[in-house]
Amino acid sequence: AYIMNKYRRSFVDDQLVIDSFESVEKYLTLLLERNLDSIEALRQWLKDKSELEAVLEEDMAWRYIRMSIDTANEEYQKAYTFFVTEIQPKLAPIDDALNKKFIACPFHTALEKEEAFAIHIRSVKSQLELYREENIEIQAFLSEKTQEFGTISGAQSIEHDGESITMQKAGLYLKEQDERLRKSVFEKMAARRSSDIADIDTLFDTLIQKRTELAKNAGFDNYRDYKFKEMGRFDYTKESCFEFHDSVEKHIVPLVKKIQQERLAKMNKEIFRPWDTAVNAEGKAPLKPFETGKEMLDGTIAVFEKINPEFSGFLKTMEEMKHFDLESK
């Protein structure tokens, strides 16, 4: 069997617990103060910086994952909010200073000749262009607000056969051949979602206002153009996206309509109902290769074992670490 060894850190303490900004500040200070007097020193500096970034990103990711899985858990909510409001804002100016230190180092131009580093350097320069001190507070606010949609949608469930089920699980009933069942479940789902319309509208209005302010602070006319640059869309333009949209409308939409008409004919219907989109048009029962999350995982591990034991080893390790949340999906 394949054994996956945990990555051993060389810069950040393996036992580090991020419970305050001060817990990571010493590593940031070491990076800021280190003398980059050779290309080898610069490479090591980048490696150490990358390791610290990975540690921080993983810590925040787990806070977000736990909060998303258990939306009613106030401790998980507080842990995520603490990171994005107390730690992230203090990281932002130091991250900008580290980017400036990197670009100011004369050896970075030698690294730029290597493709992998060229891509990274391009991203760093873009981050420097986007950084505005006045946006730190806005970004913290946005990080906190954007998770609210997940909290709202994650709390949604319906009653079916005397049982409270998640929206993901309810969606499976839309594949059943019994139209009365599909219609009933769909209407319950729609009613539940409708009850959150006012809250979601308010949230969306707030996000639009703050995102527009963020973009204008950075010198952009709108948030779309700002986000395009922030996400590193270097190899194509927004005009390329518009052209793609036009192509989809011209070539794909007619195909989808044709497929829908063929589905209608097979179902002996004249118009689509919203609960008809997932059901098998030929009257076949939905496939049920597994009943539980454990069955799904065990089956996947068995298949991956035949393909490559390394793949199944990854899944086994993730299972041991309790990194799966399959039942609710």
Predicted regions and their residues:
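A well-structured
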Residues: 2-289, 299
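Auxiliary, metal-adjacent structural segments of Zn-dependent hydrolase domains
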Residues: 282-329
